[in-house]
Amino acid sequence: MKRQRGNDPPRTFVAFVRRYPRIGKAWDLLGEAGNSGPLDPKTARLVKLGIHIATRSEGGTHAAVRKALMAGSRPEEIYQVVALAAGALGLPTAVAAFTWVEEELKKAGNKRSRRADAAPPRTASDAGS
């Protein structure tokens, strides 16, 4: 398995792929295939963050935030992904994701207040976009 410094996979994942090495190899190939397209790594990481938010995957969202930061995403860009989720997925999903994102950004030292003016205001016409 490939590892990036500072981004070691969870111990349970490591144990799983040790037990099932062919699945681990297939996972690596799947990742390589998905990353071999026209999107730059930062944009791809933001898209993956949106996918994890859409599936309400808490662990996946935490990991996606860490990986987006490592790919050069700014906290404001990550928060925009969460804001976009509100219109497409509903407020409960977006609020849950906001919590997960906040937790991860605080761990990374990118503290941001929960002020209402932290992001540009959204209008009702933005909700369906």
What residues fall within each predicted segment?
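Mid-chain, well-packed structural core segment of small domains
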Residues: 55-83
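Acidic, glycine/proline-rich low-complexity segments that act as flexible tails and inter-domain linkers
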Residues: 1-43, 70, 96-129
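A general alpha-helix detector
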Residues: 12, 29-30, 46, 63-67, ...
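Alpha-helix boundary/capping and short turn/kink residues
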Residues: 36, 40, 58-59, 74, ...
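Amphipathic, charged-and-aliphatic alpha-helical interface segments
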Residues: 45-58
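Residues within well-ordered alpha-helical secondary structure of globular protein domains
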Residues: 29, 50, 84-87
